[in-house]
Amino acid sequence: MDKVAQYKQIARELLVEDSQTGTMIEPSIRRQFIGDDENGHYLLYHIGWWDQYKRQYGCFLHLEVTEDGKIWIQHDGTDNPIAIRLVRQGVPKEDIVFGFHAPYKRSYSGFASMEL
């Protein structure tokens, strides 16, 4: 399996697992996984209602696997940093890009410091 396909599989597996586990503060709010293997986008959303009056909808985790073999973390709103979990799955730090940081800050992260 080539690196891009492997990274897509890892991203999908981690986010599917997250969509099925964990506890929500409000039972009426659910997690939804959205995966696009063709374009390499993997997202987790919160969807539902808080106290029947406040709509909850938003992406809290977005990974993008690019054709150059990098995993871009576009957003990580989790308590368990996805970058650490990717490293534990065998993804080298130089293949993980913090897309949510400005390009000039990325070189200080210890991870890849590329521009999109």
Predicted region positions:
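Terminal domain-initiation and capping elements
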Residues: 1-116
